[in-house]
UniProtKB/Swiss-Prot annotation:
Protein's name in the database: Protein BRANCHLESS TRICHOME
UniProt entry keywords in alphabetical sequence: Coiled coil
Coiled coil: 69-199
Consequence of gene loss (knockout): Shows trichomes with no branching.
Record InterPro entries: BLT-like (IPR043424)
Keyword Coiled coil: yes
Oligomer and partners: Interacts with STI.
Entry keyword Coiled coil: yes
UniProt biased composition (Polar residues): 1-12
Region annotated Disordered, chain positions: 1-30
One BP annotation, GO: trichome branching
Gene name per UniProt: BLT
Organism (species): Arabidopsis thaliana (Mouse-ear cress)
Purpose: Acts as a key regulator of trichome branching. Could participate with STI in the same pathway. Also plays a role in integrating endoreplication levels with cell shape.
Length: 273
């Protein structure tokens, strides 16, 4: 773009060349005369040679070239000034953009710092929670182990309690069997005593039966009781012992069926009959 401007600028400058000012050209010619005086063979003021004329033509061409170069340089200076203005505007825009970018970078850095601090706080929180979780897990493992030990102890206690109950039941059974055997032995002895005591009475009744038949009332023969009496029912000791024996047998069966300790305590504490 700049090359095109540079190529088109001389043509535009040729079209824009102004007419030279005679006063300014005269001043320039006097300056050139004072600077470049031709050498004269004689100090003749009317001396004029062809070289001086040629020199004057060269001087005019030089002045023309200077005017052309001045216009060209002025146009180039205007372009340069415009470019400088554009560059200044771009520089200002770049500075503003850089300031905005710096502000944005500062803001992002602040956000990043906040995010980093938040992440560090979260990591510390996660570490603390992980430590608490690990401690809770270890506590749970310990509690499970203690619970398992307590369960084993309870099982062992149950087994020991069951064995103790079985032993107590066995002792109660042996005690009741012993008592039952004692009761049976006492029952047999009572039967023997009763039989031994009943034999003389039977003999006496057998001996006194003929005499009693002789003096028997005829009403009794006919089935009439002249003196009715109410006789009290007398139970023998053997019947009493038999009923107690049956009751204790029933209690023993209930005790062996239920197999509970509270049931056997009153039996063990009760005195033998």
């Amino acid at each position: 773009m700049k090359d095109m401007k540079m190529q088109s600028s001389p043509e535009t400058m040729m079209t824009r060349i102004p007419t030279p000012d005679p006063h300014s050209t005269g001043v320039r010619e006097d300056a050139m005369d004072s600077v470049c005086k031709p050498w004269k063979l004689y100090e003749n003021p009317y001396y004029c040679s062809s070289q001086s004329q040629q020199h004057q033509h060269q001087r005019k061409a030089f002045i023309w070239d200077l005017n052309f170069i001045k216009v060209f340089m002025e146009s180039e200076l205007g372009k340069a000034q415009d470019e400088i203005k554009e560059l200044k505007a771009e520089l200002d825009y770049e500075r503003k953009a850089r300031r905005r970018a710096e502000l944005m970078i500062k803001k992002l850095a602040k956000d990043v710092e906040e995010e980093r601090m938040a992440r560090e706080a979260e990591e510390m929180q996660n570490k603390r929670l992980f430590k608490e979780l690990s401690s809770e897990k270890s506590e749970m493992v310990r509690m499970k182990r203690d619970l398992e030990e307590e369960r084993q102890m309870h099982r062992l206690a149950e087994v020991l309690r069951e064995e103790r109950v079985q032993m107590k039941l066995m002792d109660a059974r042996l005690f009741l069997e012993e008592k039952l055997s004692e009761l049976e032995e006492a029952n047999r002895q009572g039967e023997r005593e009763r039989n031994r005591m009943m034999k003389p009475k039977i003999l006496e009744r057998a001996c006194s039966s003929p005499a009693r038949r002789r003096c028997e009332n005829p009403q009794i023969k006919r089935g009439i009781n002249p003196f009715p009496r109410v006789m009290r029912a007398i139970r023998s000791k053997s019947e009493k012992w038999g009923s107690k024996l049956e009751c204790q047998k029933v209690q023993l069966k209930i005790l062996l069926r239920q197999k509970t300790t509270p049931r056997c305590t009153p039996l063990l504490s009760s005195p033998p009959p």
